């Protein structure tokens, strides 16, 4: 039976879109603090959802809902047009629920994220940043993946050239090049980072290199520890032999299996949090 209009999916295709969510906060200068701000509010802050390097994300996001602390008036704020952000003042840090609604053509369910609002500097030179009243930025890079999107949404994501390319049999690198030549939308992040945007392919490659080096270090540590263990066992065997102590049978290595009675005791303690 043919799919209903607008619900036919592009099989075997996954498309991702990167974005950034987070917050910026800055302490008030007592000399210039606005008079209409509550006396106990020490900071002005902004929570947001943005495209990487200012990329437009409004073609796949319908609206963003921010759920603030219950002490705020109308603590659930919905923003239907970019910039997707909420600006407020306050004195405390708390968790903010961010709910992203996709355009109706996507036929996708909303995605929920959580962000911890940071008001105070952290990391190197935290005290210096506090004295200088610098902006505290706390943000995360995220990617949303659309698996087998409906055709209409696929066209939205690719700038209108997606299904035409699929019909012509283009795939992989050729399809991507054709899309870029037609001016289609892409999910490519910038090659180099800037002061405003730390996310880039260069930074990504540096992070991959760092992880590779860390993996080598861990592997070497494991190798060294195994060699030390073998040497200790050999020395222990020599001491036992010199004292005439019978050699003990080798212990079986841990198989990774949990006894049935242990599984029963653990039941109910592992799993997703209560909804």
From Swiss-Prot:
Region (Disordered), start-end ranges: 161-207, 239-275
GO molecular function: histone binding
Record carries keyword Transcription regulation: yes
Chain intervals with Polar residues compositional bias: 163-183
Keyword Transcription regulation: yes
Compartment(s): Cytoplasm; Nucleus
Coiled coil feature spans: 202-242
One cellular component (GO) term of this entry: chromosome, telomeric region
GO biological process: chromatin remodeling; DNA repair; regulation of transcription by RNA polymerase II; subtelomeric heterochromatin formation
Domain comment as written in the entry: The coiled-coil domain is required for assembly into the NuA4 complex.
Quaternary context: Component of the SWR1 chromatin-remodeling complex and of the NuA4 histone acetyltransferase complex.
PANTHER family: PROTEIN AF-9 HOMOLOG
Function description: Component of the SWR1 complex which mediates the ATP-dependent exchange of histone H2A for the H2A variant HZT1 leading to transcriptional regulation of selected genes by chromatin remodeling. Component of the NuA4 histone acetyltransferase complex which is involved in transcriptional activation of selected genes principally by acetylation of nucleosomal histones H4 and H2A. The NuA4 complex is also involved in DNA repair. Yaf9 may also be required for viability in conditions in which the structural integrity of the spindle is compromised.
Name used for this protein in its record: Protein AF-9 homolog
Species in which this protein is naturally found: Emericella nidulans (strain FGSC A4 / ATCC 38163 / CBS 112.46 / NRRL 194 / M139) (Aspergillus nidulans)
Gene: yaf9
């Amino acid at each position: 039976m043919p799919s209903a209009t607008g619900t036919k999916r592009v099989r075997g295709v996954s498309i991702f879109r990167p974005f950034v969510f987070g917050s910026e906060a800055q302490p008030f200068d007592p000399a210039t603090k606005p008079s209409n701000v509550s006396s106990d509010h020490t900071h002005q802050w902004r929570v947001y959802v943005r495209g990487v390097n200012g990329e437009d994300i409004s073609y796949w996001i319908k609206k963003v809902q921010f759920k603030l602390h219950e002490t705020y008036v109308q603590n659930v704020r919905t923003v239907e047009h970019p910039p997707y952000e909420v600006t407020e003042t306050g004195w405390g840090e708390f968790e903010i629920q961010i709910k992203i609604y996709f355009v109706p053509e996507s036929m996708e369910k909303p995605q929920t994220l959580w962000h911890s609002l940071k008001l105070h500097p952290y990391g190197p030179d935290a005290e210096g940043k506090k004295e200088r009243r610098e902006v505290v930025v706390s943000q995360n890079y995220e990617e949303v993946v659309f698996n087998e999107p409906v055709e209409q949404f696929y066209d939205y994501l690719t700038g209108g050239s997606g299904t035409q390319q699929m019909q012509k049999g283009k795939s992989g690198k050729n399809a991507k090049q054709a899309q870029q030549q037609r001016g289609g939308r892409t999910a490519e992040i910038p090659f180099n980072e800037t002061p405003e945007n730390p996310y880039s392919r260069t930074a990504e490659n540096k992070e991959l290199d760092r992880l590779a080096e860390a993996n080598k270090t861990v592997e070497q540590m494991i190798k060294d520890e195994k060699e030390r263990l073998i040497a200790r066992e050999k020395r222990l065997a020599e001491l036992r032999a010199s004292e005439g102590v019978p050699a003990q049978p080798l212990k079986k290595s841990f198989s990774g299996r949990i006894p049935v009675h242990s599984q029963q005791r653990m039941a109910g303690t592992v799993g997703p949090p209560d909804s």
